[in-house]
Amino acid sequence: MTFEDVAVYFSQEEWGLLDTAQRALYRHVMLENFTLVTSLGLSTSRPRVVIQLERGEEPWVPSGKDMTLARNTYGRLNSGSWSLTEDRDVSGEWPRAFPDTPPGMTTSVFPVADACHSVKSLQRQPGASPSQERKPTGVSVIYWERLLLGSRSDQASISLRLTSPLRPPKSSRPREKTFTEYRVPGRQPRTPERQKPCAQEVPGRAFGNASDLKAASGGRDRRMGAAWQEPHRLLGGQEPSTWDELGEALHAGEKSFECRACSKVFVKSSDLLKHLRTHTGERPYECTQCGKAFSQTSHLTQHQRIHSGETPYACPVCGKAFRHSSSLVRHQRIHTAEKSFRCSECGKAFSHGSNLSQHRKIHAGGRPYACAQCGRRFCRNSHLIQHERTHTGEKPFVCALCGAAFSQGSSLFLHQRVHTGEKPFACAQCGRSFSRSSNLTQHQLLHTGERPFRCVDCGKGFAKGAVLLSHRRIHTGEKPFVCTQCGRAFRERPALLHHQRIHTTEKTNAAAPDCTPGPGFLQGHHRKVRRGGKPSPVLKPAKV
């Protein structure tokens, strides 16, 4: 077998009909086929078309050259020291050109009789010269079933045959190399009458044409984007060097099955088959109750628990049950206060990786969701929805026991612990328990004496971030809490609430002004009492 047996040529007119992506696909496959033939020791000279492709020149040939190079291919293969054999009887010649070829395009092909189902093997013939005793490599072979006949490159149907990773048995029998075929989504070649349609090698349904495949996959091949649009990405990847090394890699437990669409590698062929469904969009496992389909049986099993209400994974600490084991693992971090996902920029830790990913958007400036009323921006749409309730006053989450309403579901969940008395967060040093993890974190600072929140202006440290924010307003002069009746502004919300009592008292009893001391006065009063000094007189409001 020579390179001419697998080469494809175009005339100048035919070459002009191809777009950029189709030409890139042609260059890549031709060079890969030449590399394969050379590695087998079957070709010594470098053909003119290969030189043109390596130089980036246009590889078209004069129209007078005979381009039906597939004629009598099977006979020529048997004449050499290597032969291409079938696992079944072969009768007749290989197809010389693809069916339905557009006018003016006569394309020679790599022989692919019954390409969807046949299994071919390369056998070493006795009596071969020593120069041809090189072992065949484990490189994937590309069989061209329908070369660039579509209007777009993603319509070209390419069959990828992955080399079997099993080591050949040590015996006197000729060494064989078997290829297993996997189909890449795209246009399927039309099948002659009385011939079964090509079946997807991934377990599932069979399709006779591209429209049926696209309808079943929901057009996923179009949504794949660059994976199908860029031939060099589709056909890229490094291959094992020799057949023996491929077998040794399998025995050593190394990954040997590679997806040609995304270069992901798997240890088992069954794992590759499952992965291929993400590209084809095939979902053969369907729920009998709602009709929803899944690509794996495990996903269907998890989904069916929604209908049955089964929650087999229970927390040993609090008894809460979950449908998925992963949900139980995330829940158990509440009890352990484990936060293994830490931000490399600010050091903030999170219990879930998804929360860390959202947090990183803050450093990157990624806050695409803006409030229409105040302009505040958020990295999540759910956070924006929660924030908008502060403007509307909406509190859709109501406690069934006491009727208290909340704007967030998490606030209701925490409130319900008041009724149940649940305190799942325990301090490891003193044993004190808390209903919230944030309260436990603040409590642990008492044991360590740590004050992680430090003011950049005066250097004063604080145990709570909220206290630092309030302290910073002393330096900035900011007073965000404004009285709606008189316009007076305050640095802290408690001070505003105390001030608003003046207006409410004036309405109920204009003759008796509110003499209730403010929070600052009471704090100073208590300090003097603790120090043994003479306390200031506490003014009490006049009785009506």
From Swiss-Prot:
One of its GO terms (biological process) is regulation of transcription by RNA polymerase II. The lineage of its organism: Eukaryota, Metazoa, Chordata, Craniata, Vertebrata. The gene is ZNF324B. This is Zinc finger protein 324B. Gene3D superfamilies: 6.10.140.140, Classic Zinc Finger. It is found in: Nucleus. There is a cross-link at K214 (Glycyl lysine isopeptide (Lys-Gly) (interchain with G-Cter in SUMO2)). PROSITE patterns: KRAB, ZINC_FINGER_C2H2_1, ZINC_FINGER_C2H2_2. It comes from Homo sapiens. GO terms for cellular component: nucleus. Signal peptide: none annotated.
